[in-house]
Structure formats: C-alpha cells, structure tokens
C-alpha cells in the first residue's frame, strides 16, 4: 500500500512533510501521536491546561488522571494512574498509584473515554523499542515538538533523525485534497508549527485505493480546522525517499473488515471479554434509541462480573454501563437512581465499606456468589424455598441448595438489624416465668465471645463447630433441621466460595461469615419460637388479670364523715343477715312483777331487737329536752347501718318495731338552744327510763292489767304541750286498735 510521508510545515509545500512519533493513542473520534517520552492525560481545566491530552470535563476524571511514559530500566512504555477513581487496562482495574506496562493494542478506559495504545509494526511483537534499534541515548538527542487538538502548545522545533531504524517509527498517512472536509482548501491547511496529525476517516476508502498509482498531493492539516473524525489503521513506511507500493490484496481486506466491525457496533473495549458462561456472552451496545432488554439488576451483575476485582463503586458501575450500552450513554442521569435502588434493595448485592485509610469515596458493591446462577438470561430470576412435596426426589442437591438460599435470604436482614442494635439482645437475655424462675432466652451476641464462625482448615474454609452450640448444643436435644441446615451451609461454602478463597481469602471469609451469622440467627429464632408458646400464654393471662384489676378496682370500706362509732359502754349484738322473712312470732312467758309500778307497752319486742341492759332500779332521769334529743340522735345514727334499734330506752308507743334501710332520718332543726331531732318516720318521742329484764330474758311492762301509762310519769322531765292528747298522739295507742303483724 503506497504511503506518503509528511514533513514539517516550515519546509516547502511541494516537498513531503514528516511527523515523528513514538506511539499513537487511537480514540473513538480522533488520534493523538505520542512525540515525547511522557504524556499526561486528565480533565480539561477552565483556567489553564495542565495536561497534554484532555479527556473531557467530567468530574469523575481528575485534572491529572494518568501518565504514559517510557521506562528506561524496563525499556517499555508504561501507564501510571494518578486519579482517585483509577482506570481500566485491558478490562482490569488499576488503582491509584500503580503502574502497568503497555503493549501495542492495549485498551485503556478512563471514565467514559476509552482509547487504544498502538506501536509501530516493527515493535508490535514484544512492545519494546529496543527491538527497533532505538537506544535511550538516541531518544534524548532530539527536541520533539508536539501539539494536540485541545490547545496544546508546540514545545520546540522539528529535529530530523537520520537513523534508518528510527525512521521506521514514522507514522505517515495519505491526505488527498478530495478527502478533506468540505470548505477546506490546500491553502487553508498550510499552517506553520503544526506537527500533530489527525486522521480522516475516508483516507483508505475504495477511491483512494484505486488512485494509489497516481502521485498524490501531500497536505498538512491543522488541528484547528479539522473535525473530530473516526480513526483509521496506520501503515508503516519503509523508505524516506519515495512512496513504496504494497500489496493491496493484503491491506484491503483488513480495512474492509475493520469497516464492517464499525458498522456492526463491535468494540475492542473490556466488554468484549466473556463475563460469565451463564450470562449469554458479552453485552451488545445496540442502538442508542432502543433500550436494552436487560433489567437493572442484570446490568449490575454483568458489570460486577466483568470487573476482575469483583467489586465496584456506584459511580464506576454507572460509568461502565454507559460505556457499554449506548442507550444509557445518551439518556439523562436519572437512571443512576434506579441503579442505586437496586443495589440497596436487592439481596444479591453486598455492600463493602472502604477501609479507614483507603482513598476514594463511596462504598464498594459486590455480587453474592450464591446468586450468580439467578442472573441467567436477561432478568433476575428469584428462587423461593420449595415445599417438600414439590421437591423432586431425583435431584436432592438442587433441593438442598434452594433451601439454603431461602434460609440465607431471610436471615441477611435479621443479621444486619441485630448487629446494628446489640443492646436489644442484652435486654432480652433473661425472661421471668410464671414460677418466678429466670430462664436464659438467647445469647447476648454471636461474636462477643470471640468465636469466629468460619475457620481455615487445611487451606479451606470450614464452619467452626463451637459457633453453633447456642442453637444446637448440649443444653437441649439435637435438632435435625438445624443439623441439616449447617451441613448444607458447609457444602455451599466448599462449592461456591472454595475457588474464590484461593484468590481473595479475605473477601471469601467475609462472605462466609455473613452467611454463617445469618443461619445462626435464623436457628435461634426458631428455637425461641418452639420454647415460648406456653410461656407466652401464661404471660398473656397475667397481663389480662392485671388489666382487669386496673379497670375495675375492688370497693374499699370508706367511713362516712357523719357516722360515729358506737359508745363502748353499749354492747349491741348484730343481727345476722337473713334473706328470708322474719321467723314466726312466739309470745314470751308472763313477766314477773317488777318493783316499779309504772305501766308500759304490753307488746314485747319482736325477735331480732335484742339488747344487754343491766338490771337496776327503774327511775326516770331528769334532763332537758335538748340533751335527750342529742343523745338519741347519736345512738340512732351509730346503729342505722346495722338495721337494728337501740333498746336502752323504753318505748312509750306501739310504733312499728322493724326499721328498714329505706327509713329516712329527718334532719335536725337547729334552734337557739341546740339541735332538735325528729323521730324516724312517724315514730313519737319517748322518755328516758330504764328497762328491767326479768329472769326469763323478757322485758318488764306494766300493761298486764290493761292499765294505760300515766302521762305525767311517762313523759316526766320533758316540756310537752298542755294538751295530753296531743302529747300522746302517735306515741301510744290502745292494744285493740290494730292487731299485731306478728300474730
């Protein structure tokens, strides 16, 4: 393939112009020639230009993010990462402060910008400049001038190297007048001090290949007047005197194949590698207007699996998705929130915080190895715990794995909650039973005793048998379900995390510890549920009794302020409570004659009105009306709650002898000389005299001869009206007026 050499623009336009470069950085829409031993790349600053290659204004890219330099001790080009977000080199993540070698065809991705590092054909086999005959001394002899499209300034004049081996490093490209963009003329393209060449996409089309036999017109294109165009493969020149024709049958198919790959949307980015055999190959960029038929969870899973470290931050995940699926690249950043929600809510993704001294911001996210098989196809396939009847007997391993996955899924959230709130375990460590005994409910914490759930045994991860004694120890009979779950967890760790432990033992141990803690908490919860029904029932009964007692308190005997205690000199026998009617009346025997000749009511007291009054001489004590009324009031008031009548005073009338609770006590009218009390109901006043008890226990009366009571003697000492009939009205009645109610 004939190639033209381009010389410096300071020479005559008729002569050929040459551009000397050590390597080329091939971007998506432009190319940059490395003409110095060190090139810096980073974000374009608004005030100054601190880097040689500007990668855009994205905040994810640092101002000086990476540096490509030639290592003299190793005699090779290397890239050193200086940005906090790192870079991807051939799909492998390179952290800040590390350097990796570069070979011809190495793919580098920084943020959303990716490019290829290319060397001349003479050094493509091993990627070392030593094989091309260039020594470190010859590299330091000349001042290399360079300029880039984004505003780089020339640093020196062109220096011609006469060594034939160094001429092999020249990158010469065909620039025809008909291949230039519209509106450009040969005169506009001749600008001095322009040493950076940007390729045109139509440089190797069919028209150019057909006209290679004609002497071409060589032009120098300025970076300020050329557009951002797609890169084309370079051709190594073999002479500096004239163009050398090459076999077009060899180069033409290579160019055609490259064009077909660009049309089909294929890329040489790290996404071309196979992510996982179950994920149906590498992702396809597809059309920018058509959304990929993949769920967000599946996109995240593919991203994490493609990363060699198997962990990425949220920003790196979104950036990787945008670089590999053109639809999300041209969409507003609102879909980043969907990625964040899927990472937080989906149990298949595990959050790993940064170390204390680790640079960068944000936590890392990784995919749980036990969920890799659930991302087959285009969507996240959720598995549920199968029932025993639905589990096929021909596949016991699959049933055990599904059961273990269900137990782990339910226990992860509980494990996080218990680790965040360890005080709740301490408060629930002991419960009080109905018998007053203290029973251990559950251990205070799983890791407080220093027992690690996962230990290394013969270079393999294994469960610590001491860790599960709380759930299946000597305190109770072995639980078959717990033993089976623990054995399934051991099988899962050996099968899924065993290979990962060889590469990253710390990460595999952390995942195994999380699974063991979740299983232990699940078993403890089931153990508490089995032991607690009877205890919970007893606690509910006690709680119900306490609530009813608080709502309906028992009535207490409260003394009334107007009720006075009875006098200690009077002993009153309380009548027992009887629900039936009064007993039949039995007339007592004839009373014996008392020394007193006064007459009283002949009808004795009914049963129930009993009193113990000492016998003595019958005499009427003289007292004023006020003192008699006050004494009667106090005695009646003190006995009204007993429903009995005090009988220490003789009756002077035939009033009803039973007093019911419905009888009302009339208030005492207050006069100038004291209180005055009315009788109960229609009861009349009675005099103050003694009652003598005979030998038979009956009361002595003077009515056995049928004589009436003398008015003057019965009401002796009391101020009564002059009319005796008024004084005795309601107080005394003849025995034959009404018959007794007890006969």
Swiss-Prot record:
Q: Where in the cell is it found?
A: Nucleus
Keyword Transcription in record: yes
Concerning SMART domains, the annotation shows: FH, FHA
Stretches of Polar residues bias are at 221-230, 562-576, 625-643, 670-686, 695-726
Enumerate the GO terms in the molecular function aspect: DNA-binding transcription activator activity, RNA polymerase II-specific; RNA polymerase II cis-regulatory region sequence-specific DNA binding; sequence-specific DNA binding
Identify the CDD domains for this entry.
FH_FOX, FHA_FKH1-like
Which residues lie within the region annotated Disordered? 214-291, 411-450, 529-743
Q: Which GO terms describe its biological process?
A: division septum assembly; positive regulation of ribosomal protein gene transcription by RNA polymerase II; regulation of DNA-templated transcription
Q: Which domain of life is it from?
A: Eukaryota
InterPro entries, alphabetized: FHA_dom, Fhl1/FHA1, Fork_head_dom, SMAD_FHA_dom_sf, WH-like_DNA-bd_sf, WH_DNA-bd_sf
| Basic and acidic residues composition bias: residue spans | 434-443
Span of domain FHA: 39-94
Free-text disruption phenotype from the record: Decreases cell population growth rate and increases cell-length; elongated cells are occasionally multiseptate. Resistance to methyl methanesulfonate.
DNA-binding region per UniProt: 291-385
Main localization of the protein? nucleus
Q: Which UniProt keywords apply?
A: Activator, Cell cycle, Cell division, DNA-binding, Mitosis, Nucleus, Septation, Transcription, Transcription regulation
Q: Which GO terms describe its cellular component?
A: nucleus
What is the purpose of this protein?
Answer: Acts as a transcriptional activator for ribosomal protein genes (RPG) that contain a HomolE UAS (upstream activating sequence) in addition to a HomolD promoter element; HomolD plays the role of a TATA box in RPG promoters that do not contain a canonical TATA sequence. Binds to HomolE elements with consensus sequence 3'-ACCCTACCCT-5' (or its inverted form AGGGTAGGGT).
Query: What name goes with this protein?
Result: Fork head transcription factor 1
**Source organism of the structure:** Schizosaccharomyces pombe (strain 972 / ATCC 24843)
């Amino acid at each position: 393939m004939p190639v033209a050499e381009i010389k410096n623009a300071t020479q005559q336009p008729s002569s050929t112009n040459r551009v000397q470069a050590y390597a080329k950085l091939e971007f998506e829409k432009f190319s940059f020639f490395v003409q110095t031993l060190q090139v810096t790349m980073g974000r374009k600053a608004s005030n100054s230009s601190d880097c040689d290659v500007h990668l855009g204004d994205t905040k994810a890219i640092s101002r000086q993010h990476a540096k490509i330099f030639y290592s003299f001790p190793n005699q090779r080009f290397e890239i050193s990462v200086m940005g906090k977000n790192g870079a991807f080199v051939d799909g492998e993540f390179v952290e800040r402060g590390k350097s990796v070698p570069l070979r011809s065809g190495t793919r580098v991705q920084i943020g959303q910008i990716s490019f290829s590092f290319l060397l001349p054909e003479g050094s493509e086999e091993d990627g070392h400049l030593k094989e091309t005959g260039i020594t470190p001394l010859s590299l330091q002899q000349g001042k290399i001038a360079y300029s880039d499209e984004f505003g780089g300034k020339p640093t020196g004049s062109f220096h011609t190297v006469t060594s034939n081996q160094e001429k092999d490093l020249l990158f010469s490209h065909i620039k025809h007048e008909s291949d230039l963009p519209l509106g450009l003329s040969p005169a506009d393209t001749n600008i001095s001090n322009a040493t950076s060449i940007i390729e045109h996409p139509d440089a190797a089309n069919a028209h150019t290949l057909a006209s290679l036999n004609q002497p071409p017109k060589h032009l120098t294109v300025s970076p300020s007047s050329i557009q951002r165009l797609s890169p084309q493969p370079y051709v190594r020149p073999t002479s500096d005197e004239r163009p050398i024709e090459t076999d077009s049958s060899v180069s033409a198919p290579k160019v055609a194949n490259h064009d077909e790959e660009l049309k089909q949307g294929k890329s040489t980015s790290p996404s071309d590698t196979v992510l996982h055999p179950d994920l149906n190959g590498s992702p396809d960029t597809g059309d920018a207007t058509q959304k990929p038929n993949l769920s967000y969870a599946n996109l995240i899973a593919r991203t994490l699996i493609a990363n060699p470290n198997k962990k990425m931050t949220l920003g790196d995940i979104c950036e990787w998705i945008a670089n590999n699926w053109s639809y999300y690249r041209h969409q507003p950043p609102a879909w980043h929130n969907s990625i964040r929600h899927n990472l937080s809510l989906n149990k298949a993704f595990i959050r790993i915080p940064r170390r204390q001294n680790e640079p960068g911001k944000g936590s890392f996210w990784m995919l749980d190895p036990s969920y890799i098989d659930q991302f087959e196809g285009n969507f996240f396939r959720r598995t549920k715990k199968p029932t025993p009847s639905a589990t096929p007997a021909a596949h016991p391993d699959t049933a055990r794995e599904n059961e273990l996955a269900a137990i782990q899924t339910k226990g992860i959230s509980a494990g996080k909650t218990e680790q965040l709130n360890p005080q709740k375990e301490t408060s629930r460590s002991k419960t009080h039973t109905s018998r007053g005994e203290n029973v251990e409910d559950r251990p205070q914490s799983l890791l407080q005793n220093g027992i690690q759930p996962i230990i290394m045994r013969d270079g393999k991860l294994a469960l610590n048998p001491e860790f599960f004694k709380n759930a299946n120890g000597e305190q109770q009979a072995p639980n078959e379900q717990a033993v089976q779950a623990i054995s399934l967890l051991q099988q899962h760790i050996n099968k899924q995390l065993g290979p990962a432990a060889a590469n990253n033992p710390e990460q595999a141990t952390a995942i195994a510890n999380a699974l063991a803690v979740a299983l232990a908490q699940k078993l403890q919860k089931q153990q508490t549920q089995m032991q607690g029904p009877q205890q919970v029932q007893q606690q509910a009964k006690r709680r119900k009794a306490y609530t009813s007692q608080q709502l309906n308190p028992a009535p207490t005997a409260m003394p009334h302020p107007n009720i006075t205690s009875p006098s200690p000199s009077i002993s009153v026998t309380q009548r027992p409570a009887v629900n039936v009617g009064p007993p039949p009346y039995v007339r007592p025997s004839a009373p014996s004659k008392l020394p007193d000749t006064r007459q009283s009511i002949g009808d004795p007291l009914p049963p129930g009105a009993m009193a113990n009054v000492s016998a003595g001489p019958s005499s009427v004590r003289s007292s004023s009306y006020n003192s008699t009324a006050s004494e009667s009031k106090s005695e009646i008031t003190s006995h009204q709650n007993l429903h009995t009548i005090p009988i220490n005073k003789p009756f002077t009338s035939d009033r009803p002898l039973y007093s019911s609770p419905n009888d009302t006590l009339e208030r005492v009218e207050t006069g100038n000389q004291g209180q005055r009390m009315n009788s109960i109901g229609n009861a009349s006043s009675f005099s103050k005299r003694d009652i003598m008890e005979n030998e038979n226990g009956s009361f002595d009366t003077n009515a056995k001869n049928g004589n009436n009571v003398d008015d003057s003697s019965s009401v002796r000492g009391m101020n009564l009206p002059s009319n005796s009939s008024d004084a005795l009205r309601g107080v005394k009645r003849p025995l034959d007026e009404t018959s007794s109610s007890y006969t």
